[in-house]
Amino acid sequence: DQKPELSLPAVADRVMEALGKYDFIVTNFANGDVIGHTLNTAAKLEACKHVSHYLDVVVHDALAKGYVVAVTADHGNIEKLYTAAGKPDGAHTTNLVPFILMDPAHSGPIALRDGCLGDVAPTVLNVMGIPQPAEMTGKSLAEGHDFGKDRKMLLIICDGWGLGSGDDGDAIHLADTPYWDSLLAEQSWSKLHASGEHVGLGSGKAGNSEAGHSNLGAGRCVMQDDVRLD
């Protein structure tokens, strides 16, 4: 918690170096999970500020270079500051996570449906015009949108970045996050399940990075070890 920005400036630089070189780029902003596990409220607010700032930097560059950009999360964490007993909370949550989609070739809103993490990879394939394999049982979150041909895409995963309560117990709400606020106010977005049976965990169980990233990449619900062993 002594360096809430972690290596995010360097991560952002690497992403921007890759823009224009690769058709598909995926990056992980780890601050929400790493700093979210601490009990340091000031550090959490600072981490949220850095995530918002570097989203602004990276997303603007990607859109200017013609990339379709999606911003989502693998599970919740940093948004919840306190337990039900009012004590500092550093655990993962069962909160929904956002899925924001921006298409620089389209000026109007994009119709998005709510879903789960297993729907993200099919959405990527939809954007890029790649046939979806039978093994992916998820469905595109933007089935009705015409992305055209030969599109490039940037997927940003904000680790541990759930949709919180929107009050004084919500770090993202309290933090100085003007760009994040503008994304929710101005861009098309939907809500994704990132916990419990929706990601192959036990019912009611908080999401985690392993379940989150495996579902995001697989395009389906991946049964996790705690369920498989039961």
Per-segment meaning from a language model:
Residues D1-D230:
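Feature captures the catalytic ectodomains and active-site-proximal regions of enzymes
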